[in-house]
């Protein structure tokens, strides 16, 4: 099944199920209000979500509405844990050779992994906001797994049993801050800003045999400012699988439901996955007679640049929807009259969506918007769905209809 989190003005959004053709969606609030709630009680909740997905696909769902990716947050807008590996041989070896010169003997003895920030994930169309352009802004296309509760010391052979969902990731990196941080031998912090996600989180069965051996054998494509930068198979060129990453992360700790583990930058078959790889190749190609790397030609991203990351199945269909983000200056995002350290707070997309047509014939929805400012964003999304009812594109809001209109619960 395909799951998303819709913007409603809250931190965690509202869980919804999306049809396999990506044309319609259905709120899952009668089953689980948020993605994290579903993950917390997966064995009970997942069958109910699957039944709702089947109803949506067969036309039997009671309250479908048009699926609009722009209304999505990250599938998990904030997670208990974000752990990122680096399993692609080409990515690691290119960067190591260009910037360190020598590959250490123990490079592939065990997986590499860092713990990143997980409290402020970016949705698929959210601006990627940075304070300084000269920090070396770079994208990194990755695949990830979302886990259920995973015990400490889980065996590699059992690790994949704890995978609940697959996701597509843009692990933003600030390359010019990395060397100083790693030089302190204390890991990444400032060089790893908020991570972006595609709208859909999917169960592994959605890609069939492409989920094999602990890897997702999907095509991953990156466009930078509308020009194809990379297209590669995410299932080849790896030294480790997700099973090994999970077992590595759980060696000394439990991994709680909602933990996300990333693959590291997809890079294979000579297709560089990020700007740093391209620069590394340029530097190595310009090496002097002693083998010292020369100067790279390609600059990192600038304000106004845009990156689009998407994964495709064997038939060419999008799997997770697209990440489509624009690099934006923090200074340009400040609201007029705001204090020097106060970033602009944008209107929730759901609220803007709901207010796009104020001439609603659904007076109950309009009254709800007017009367309850404390929950205006959530009411707005519901009013928008109710507005679609008036034009024949959806069915009325469950909460307005009463408990009988809630989705049937399996079991």
Predicted regions and their residues:
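Catalytic-pocket segment enriched in acidic/His residues
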Residues: 8, 12-13, 175-354, 408-411
């Amino acid at each position: 099944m395909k799951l998303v989190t819709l913007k409603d003005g809250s931190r965690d959004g509202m869980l919804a199920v999306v049809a396999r053709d990506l044309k319609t969606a259905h709120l899952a609030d009668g089953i689980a209000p948020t993605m994290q709630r579903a993950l917390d009680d997966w064995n009970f909740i997942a069958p109910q979500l699957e039944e709702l997905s089947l109803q949506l696909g067969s036309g039997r769902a009671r309250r479908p509405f048009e699926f609009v990716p722009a209304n999505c947050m990250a599938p998990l807008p904030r997670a208990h844990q974000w752990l990122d590996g680096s399993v692609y041989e080409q990515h690691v070896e290119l960067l190591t050779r260009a910037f360190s010169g020598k590959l250490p003997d123990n490079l592939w003895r065990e997986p590499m992994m860092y713990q990143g920030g997980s409290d402020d994930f970016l949705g698929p169309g959210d601006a990627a906001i940075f304070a300084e352009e000269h920090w070396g802004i770079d994208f990194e296309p990755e695949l990830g797994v979302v886990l259920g509760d995973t015990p400490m010391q889980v065996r590699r052979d059992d690790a994949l049993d704890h995978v609940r969902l697959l996701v597509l990731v843009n692990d933003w990196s600030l390359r010019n801050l990395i060397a100083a941080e790693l030089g302190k031998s204390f890991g990444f912090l400032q060089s790893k800003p908020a991570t972006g996600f595609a709208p859909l989180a999917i169960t592994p069965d959605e890609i069939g045999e492409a989920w094999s051996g602990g890897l997702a054998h999907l095509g991953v494509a990156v466009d930078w400012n509308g020009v194809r930068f990379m297209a590669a198979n995410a299932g080849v060129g790896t030294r480790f699988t997700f099973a090994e990453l999970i077992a590595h992360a759980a060696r000394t700790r439990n991994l709680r439901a909602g933990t996300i583990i990333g693959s590291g930058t997809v890079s294979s078959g000579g297709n560089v996955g990020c700007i740093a790889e391209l620069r590394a190749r340029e530097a190595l190609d310009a090496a002097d007679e002693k083998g010292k790397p020369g100067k790279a030609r390609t600059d990192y991203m600038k304000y106004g640049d845009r990156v689009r990351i998407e994964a495709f199945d064997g038939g060419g269909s999008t799997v997770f929807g697209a990440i489509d983000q624009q690099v934006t200056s923090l200074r340009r995002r400040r609201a007029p009259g705001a204090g020097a350290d106060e970033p602009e707070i944008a209107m929730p997309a759901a609220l803007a969506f709901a207010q796009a047509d104020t001439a609603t014939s659904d007076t109950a929805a309009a009254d709800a918007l007017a009367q309850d400012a404390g929950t205006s964003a959530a009411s707005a999304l519901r009013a928008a769905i109710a507005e679609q009812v008036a034009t024949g594109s959806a069915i009325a809001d469950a909460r307005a209809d009463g408990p009988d209109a809630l989705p049937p619960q399996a079991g």
